[in-house]
Amino acid sequence: MDDDAGDGAASGGTKRKVTAASSSAAAKGKAAGKGKAASKASALATAKESSLLKQKSPAEFFAENKNIAGFDNPGKSLYTTMRELVENALDSAESISELPDIEIIIEEITKSKFNTMIGLVDRQRIDEELYDDFESAKAREKRLAKEARFQETQAKNAALGKKVKEAPAARGKGRGEAAFFRVTCKDNGRGMPHDDIPNMLGRVLSGTKYGLRQTRGKFGLGAKMALIWSKMSTGLPIEIKSSMKGQNFISFCLLDIDIHKNVPHVHLHEKRENKDRWHGAELQVIIEGNWTTHRSKILHYMRQMAVITPYAQFLFRFLSDSPDKNLTIQFARRTDVMPPIPLQTKHHPSAVDLLLIKRLISETTKQNLLQFLQHEFVNISKSHAERLIGEMGPDFSAKTTVKSLTSQQLVRIHQLFRQAKFDDPSGNCLSPAGEYNLRLGIIKELHPDLVATHASSPQVFEGHPFIVEAGISIGGKDVKHGLNIFRYANRIPLLFEQGADVITRTALKRINWSSYKINQQQDKIGVFVSIVSTKIPFKGTGKEYIGDDITEIASAVQSALKQCCLQLKSKIVKKLQARERQDRKRNLNRYIPDVARAIMETLGEIADESPPKRPRYDKEDEELLEKVNSEEVTEMTFRDCLTQHVEQVDYEMALEYAMQSGVSEEPREALYLNSLEGSYKFIDFQSPVFVFRFIP
């Protein structure tokens, strides 16, 4: 009985296991079915999302691709913000022919001060290990030991006269604590119309600089990108003060930008009293930045801008809570000669594409094809336009309505423009700095020993005119040994990606400096090249350099630098000759005592000899020997005569050098003309040789 019962129990247990296993399998099957259904639903949702059409505003695009506009990191963002504001200020002042007077202030804002500005209360840390700068006791001990070894090594190097390195900064794994700066730029320019301020600064890709002309900007963003970066890094609006000439009020505007809609978001827009009758603009923006990493770039930019715009006055200030970090630099105005304002020009036929032709047709006020060709393009006269129309084919005539042209006809016009011959565009629309300003700027900032400048005539690249200006200096203050290359495009400095630039490569590889008596390794050489054009062929997304693949520009840069080198060579050769002359005089003076003594001894021996039966000397020689015998002529006499002869030869050579170089080193004498009647004030006429003055 018991055995049977046990068998029954075992059998029942087996049945229960089978039932449980089958129910488990069923559950797994249901779960797998649910998983497949969920996966299918997720795939459908993804497909549905990917099929949705999305759009981005221009502001949103540049916010997501801020590196295109030069906002790669906080340090470069600080540099680019300052640069954009300065260039806007220069454009504004030059547009009304006002000598620019620009003040730039970069103020460091501490974290606690920034939190106070935005109404955020500082909070004490609770979990120290959560933070990136947390350091355990063991790690701290290891770091201090490493720093002690480093300091010991540097002390030994200093004792031996070797170069001492700075201690490496500790780096964490995270981004670290952000640093904030208030950037302010004030100018004396045109100012902005009160009602236009929101759209001028709060709407990306809208402005007054669009058109075919020489412009400083690269993208037409200006302060708008600084505002986008401010919104991304601090969330604070930009503050604008502006007043135009003759206005009795100052426009005050506080605004930011709606990134997704690309429209301005105005917080405050009002008119305030203008007691001082000030005109210009003052922009103030608070952004995240890094002064430490880009301090040198910012100062180099200001110095190079002072070189290319010597007619402007810049006051740069950096303010910090630590007084020893404060910095004030003034770049004084050196001249009041300003370049002409760049003029807007029409398109050259060889430089247009099909899309541009369509846009010009949609915007033109001309009715027929003949008028359209004459008035919408440069270098197409009436007779030339008639010849072009005749070449287009039977479907075209001078009276053809431009609005009725088909796509095929537009392609035909475009093809003819690419193949036909046109005169090169003139450079009248360009505004180079000018040789005078470039030379003054170099002298003002570098104080070189020698300087030479050259400006090329207008040349053409793909239908766009360009002018190359170059300057080379030798010596000067704050200039390193070797080549110091300063690059400009449309009168703005280019500081990044120098290695691939056409100016750098030309200076390094295409100029044989030694043939111009210039030592490329030891001399302090400043190479300045400025290229202005209606279209600068920048390379790279950041537009920081000009490519070396454009033959016309590379050839023009090389030619301009060679012209400067030729000027310097003649000056260097004359300088070497003058140095050789001085060395020769010094050497002659050194040997005068020995020569005088030798002559005196020789003459003394001859004079002591018994007189010959037949005369061997001329009468003058006999007289000299008698004077030697009577000690009327001594060694000092010969010294004086030799010294006078050396001085005479030196004077004659100096006079010849002065006549060749155009600079007289002769003593200057005042020349006066006295007026017999009347009392007048006359200016002095000065030259390297004399001063001409009327005396009443």
From Swiss-Prot:
Its main location: nucleus. Residues 20-36 have a biased composition (Low complexity). The keyword ATP-binding applies. Keywords: ATP-binding, DNA-binding, Isomerase, Nucleotide-binding, Nucleus, Topoisomerase. InterPro entries: HATPase_C_sf, Ribosomal_Su5_D2-typ_SF, Ribsml_uS5_D2-typ_fold_subgr, TopoVI_B, TopoVI_B_transducer. ATP binds at residues 88, 187, 208-209, 217-224, 543. It comes from the Eukaryota. It is an enzyme of class 5 (isomerase). One of its GO terms (molecular function) is ATP binding. One of its GO terms (cellular component) is DNA topoisomerase type II (double strand cut, ATP-hydrolyzing) complex. Homodimer. Heterotetramer of two TOP6A and two TOP6B subunits. Interacts with SPO11-4. This is DNA topoisomerase 6 subunit B. It comes from Oryza sativa subsp. japonica.
